[in-house]
Amino acid sequence: RIPHEPVHWDQDVTYDPLADAGKPARVAELIHAFRQRGHLAADTDPLAYRLRRHPDLNFSSYGLSLWDLDRVFPTGGLGGKDRATLREILQMLRDAYSRYVGVEYMHIQDPAQRRWWQERMEGVTPSIDTAERRRILTKLMQAEAFEVFLQTKYVGQKRFSLEGGESLIVLLDRLIDDAAHDGIEEAAIGMAHRGRLNVLTNIAGKSYGQVFDEFDGNYLTNGQGSGDVKYHLGTTGTFTGTDDVTTKVSLAANPSHLETVDGVLEGIVRAKLDRSGSGADGSYNVLPILVHGDAAFAGQGVVYEVLNMSQLPGYHTGGTIHVIVNNQIGFTTGNALGRSTTYPSDLAKGLQVPIFHVNGDAPESVARVA
């Protein structure tokens, strides 16, 4: 497949000095358009049958033609260059904003924050070394092997698998690993039932034996109460990252009411911060992570209620990382019938936060975003 709109033939036999004088301004408009809407052409959907395109990202929409591709224009600092050919400018913009990662940050009102994100998106992408690639592969294999075993051993039992979204394990692994190296003492995770068993074993440290006992019906007999289904349960364990760095990981219990855990997890984290005295000086030792489904994030009011409390002094936790696993369906409801927005994450724009869209079939890009 051709990843972008083909360049069409155009005559270039006339000379218009006024039109040529305005081309640098039109190139600047093109650069701004990619920063603002490049995500609309990014290859972020593993199931896409049609390539995503947008007229604002086609240079011909700005009066530029194929004859301008090798002409030099000012870039305004794009990619660390003051001047570049239109061909080079397009390559840098597509690499930054329209490959496997799409990013939305131009809605942020603070110019300094926008520049910060701009520099990181348009700078040189650090390469992933062999050791990191091996860790990514290991995590993917662990996630897939776990699901395949459960499917084979416990046929017909409910488990709400992570199949198709195994790169979530790569994302959480990289997030918590980096956080542990930066001094975070605990990662607190809240999520619904989809993929919970995989996260319990491959991230939160619950043993495979414990999970298999629950499938076999071997529960502890010395407790009181009726218990709960295995994909509602939480745990507390130890995460081991690169260089043998460790940190505590807690996964909060959650019923089948999807986003119920959101406010509960924020309360848990705030209580931990208050008890430890963290946060008063602007540093936080607990990292909250919430994992959502696409339909639930867009459709359940508790999500926005929790987001709306994020900047209030009485509820602030230093920032929460929200991960949306986009299955492109809400039980039996398709995207077109489940929300009125382009993305399930669109409601988060009101909080001035950057939003990343990444192709789940590109695990290295998932790790880079993390």
Which stretches of residues belong to each language-model region?
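Weak global preference for isoleucine
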Residues: I2, I31, I89, I108, ...
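Extended, charge-enriched "interface" segments that sit outside catalytic cores
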Residues: R1-L168, I184
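Active-site pocket-lining segments that scaffold enzyme catalytic pockets across diverse folds
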Residues: A145, F149-G209
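Cofactor-binding active-site loop characterized by glycine-rich and histidine/acidic residues
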Residues: A188-G360
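Structural signal for hydrophobic packing residues in well-ordered secondary-structure cores
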Residues: I31-R35, L93-V101, R120-T125, M141-E144, ...
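Generic recognition of stable, solvent-exposed alpha-helical segments in well-folded globular domains
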Residues: G22-E29, A42, A84, E88, ...
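A generic structural micro-environment signature
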Residues: P46, R50-R53, G63, D68-D70, ...
